[in-house]
Structures are given as C-alpha cells and as structure tokens.
C-alpha cells in the first residue's frame, strides 16, 4: 500500500520529496512543505555586537535588505558591511562580525586639531594612535608630543599642551595717552586706549590680537590723542581781559577786571575745561561790569531787642522832692542810680568803593533810637520815685522830723 502525506522534515530542504517504508512494507511518499511562506526569509539573523534596524517590518520578501547598528561601546569596522539580504531560497545572505570595540572620537583641543588623515575615521580599535597639529595662532613646542593612543579601557591617553599662543607685536607708545594691557599681548588678548586730560581719542578704544594670514597681529590701527581747544573767551563791556592768546588749551586761564567806576559781578577768573563729549568749553560764563551808581545798595538792618538788661552804667540822676505846705528844710538828697540802656554792637556790613566813607545815615538812625530809649527809661524812673514819695510817705517823714525838733 502506498500513501502520500505533506509534512516537514528538518533534515531535508524545503520542497524535497521524501519516501519512507514502514515495517509492514507500506511505502509513504511525502512532499515537504516550506518552513516559511514562499518568498519570506523570516526574522533577520543575530549578529554579534549589533542589532537590526527593523522599524515596523515583520515580513521580508525576496531581495529585502536589513541594516544593523553597533551596540554601545562598539564601532563598525571600516570596509565591512552591516547589511544582510533576503535571497531567493528564503535564506539571509552570509555575514561576518562587523562591530568591534573602539574608542570614541578623539578629544577636541582648544590649541590643536587632528591631522587631516584622521578627519573621516570613526573606528578606533585599541592601540590606534592619532596625531594633532597646532591651530592657527599657536606654535608647537618641539619638546612635547602631539600624539594620543586608544587604551585598553577604550579611553584616549592625555595630550600635553604642546602648542603655545603666538604673540602680537609690542604696542607702540600712545602720545598724550595711556595703553591698558590687562592680559598681555598673546593671541586672543585685547588692549584698551585712553587719552590724558585735555586730549580727545581719535580712533577705536580697543584692538584685538587675532590671526592675520599665517601669523597673528592687531586687528586695527592704533588711535591717536589730539589736543582739545576752547573757543575764544567772550569779551565784556566796560572791562578788560588778561591772558589772551591765539588759542586756548585745556586748563588755560583768563582773568577779567572792570573799568574805573564799575563793579564786577560774577567770576573774575574762568578756565578752559572739557565737556562729557570731549568738547572744549569755559568753566563758567564771563562776569559783568555794572556802573556803581546803578548797583542797588541794601539798607542796613538793625536788630533792636524788645527787652534787655542794661549793662553800661551812666551818670547817676539826683532829684530832691519838697514837702508841700512847709518851708523847705535842708534834707539829705536821695540819690538813684539809673543804668543806661544796653547798646547792641553794630553788625551791619557797609560796602563802598571808598574805604574811608562811613554810613553816617545809619549811625544817626541808631544814635537817635538809643536816645529815645534812654528818655523812656528816665520817665519810668521818675514815675517810680514819685510813687515812693507819695503823700502818706511824706506825712510820716514830716512827723518824724517834728518829733526830732521838740527834743
């Protein structure tokens, strides 16, 4: 008896015809089916140190291609493919290990760069040596090496600073100014300029040491300091000016004075100075000369206190009061000392073109006022005496005298 079945024998290829005979002599004919759907290679193969880039694909028809990327810590070996292809027989193309351990891209240095032969390299297995060269603006120190090696722990050996900055030419002196050099004159340094008082900076305030061709130099021309002048000082009416010249430099002085019969108002001396915008200007406006007769004179001010304690004694005033109705009899006169009114010192300032002239009007006013005050004080004293010697006091005084006479 002969029977036929469809099945799969892992020892045979897909589509092979397999004939088997049982112990009873039956013959079985089997046509093996494909392990996968015809034209589908199935999942991509595993490759050491790499992983396939599948995206959303799950089926791979004939001639499909799958690329791989290296795992962390591994780099693709140059000249080795990272792609497999689905063949007509449903198998993936042969492949080899193309990811190996490698150092990362060599360190970028501020003073040096990799030589051109290393620009396109991305695979640096252990033991790889790379070499640097100085960047523009730097010069190599012969005693130091510019090489670095990929070590066993996949790090690069340190590189000595074998390049030093080039120096720009020494700056020339700045006439009537100052050059500030904060960090030297090496490549990348900046210097600043300023002028002395009375001078203006013409040009830029700072320049930079930079690359010019194959060397380094200052990136601009040096400035200059030019002297600042003031305009001619203004003339004044009824006066003269001393210190005139053809030009007026910083801090130069002119002096004004008035003609006879005129008084100067303002600053008699002005000097040439500089504004914030470096423009010459005079320190103040010129003075004015005004005719003496037109100058207003301030009246003197006298400070008279309302009350005060007399301090300067005057000649005593003597007064005898007679007894009414009786013959006058000799009596011992009563003497009352009347102090003079306090006189404040005259503090009024008097100004005159003639030093010998005095303010007679003001003095007469003061003396008259003092006399009035003295007269008022005298009247008060008389009133006081009259009160003391009233009729009652006089009666007592007369009775006492009669008693003395009878004795």
Curated annotation (Swiss-Prot):
Residues 40-368 are extracellular. Pfam families: Sushi. Disulfide bonds join 41-86, 70-99, 103-150, 134-163, 168-209, 195-225, 230-272, 258-289. One of its GO terms (biological process) is complement activation, classical pathway. Belongs to the receptors of complement activation (RCA) family. The chain crosses the membrane at residues 369-389. InterPro entries: Compl-Cell_Adhes-Reg, Sushi/SCR/CCP_sf, Sushi_SCR_CCP_dom. Residues 343-357 have a biased composition (Basic and acidic residues). It comes from Mus musculus. The keyword Secreted does not apply. The first Sushi domain (SCR1) is not necessary for function. SCR2 and SCR4 provide the proper conformation for the active site on SCR3. The gene is Cd55b. This is Complement decay-accelerating factor transmembrane isoform. It is a single-pass type I membrane protein. Testis, spleen and lymph node. The lineage of its organism: Eukaryota, Metazoa, Chordata, Craniata, Vertebrata. Glycans are attached at residues 192, 267. GO terms for cellular component: membrane. It comes from the Eukaryota. Residues 1-39 form the signal peptide. Its main location: membrane. Keywords: Complement pathway, Disulfide bond, Glycoprotein, Immunity, Innate immunity, Membrane, Repeat, Signal, Sushi, Transmembrane, Transmembrane helix. CDD domains: CCP (cd00033). Residues 306-324 have a biased composition (Polar residues). Residues 390-407 are cytoplasmic. Residues 40-101, 102-165, 166-227, 228-291 form the Sushi domain. It is found in: Membrane.
